[in-house]
Regions:
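Second-shell loop/turn segments in exported
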Residues: 38-42
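Sec-dependent N-terminal signal peptides
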Residues: 4-13
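SH3-family beta-barrel domains
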Residues: 18-36, 46-51, 58-100, 104-133, ...
Length: 147
């Protein structure tokens, strides 16, 4: 019985060590190919034309990363086409950008769904963003591209 308990405990602790960790990166160029497999030999599935578009990294194979975008498209992108710059997309209509990280501060602008925001920093449930010439704070749960 002790062996069974020991093996179960060992399984649960080592399982977490080998779990794949997902994280976000952004597209590093204006033109990026999403391929069906982890090589230049695979055909292009999607041609992205939006620099800093956030993508979720799900797996890796040598110099390629398997990604998923905000529309659930998945495929492989070469690491030279990815950037560590922080950005996110608004996932709700009429996202308010506030002067300070509180709903009681002055709203500065309203963003529509799908708007690309550069992330300066996040603090608790708020993120300081820049969109065009506007800067301010938005609720973290209204953004896609952050963990």
């Amino acid at each position: 019985m002790q062996k069974v308990i020991f093996l179960l405990v060992l399984f649960f602790f080592t399982h977490n060590l080998f779990a794949k960790e997902e994280y976000f990166l952004t597209l590093g160029n204006e033109k990026v190919n999403l391929r069906q497999g982890p090589s230049f030999d695979y055909p292009v599935k999607i041609f992205y034309k939006k620099k800093f578009l956030p993508v979720l990294i799900q797996d890796k194979s040598d110099t390629f990363r398997k990604i998923r975008d905000h529309e659930n498209n998945s495929g492989w992108i070469h690491i030279s086409q990815l950037s560590k710059k922080k950005a996110a997309l608004t996932i709700d209509d009429d996202v308010l950008v506030f002067n300070k990280p509180t709903i009681y501060s002055t709203p500065k602008v309203i963003l529509k769904k799908g708007r690309l925001c550069k992330i300066k920093k996040c603090k608790d449930e708020w993120c300081n963003i820049t969109v065009d010439k506007f800067k301010g704070w938005v609720k973290k749960d209204s953004l896609w591209g952050l963990l």
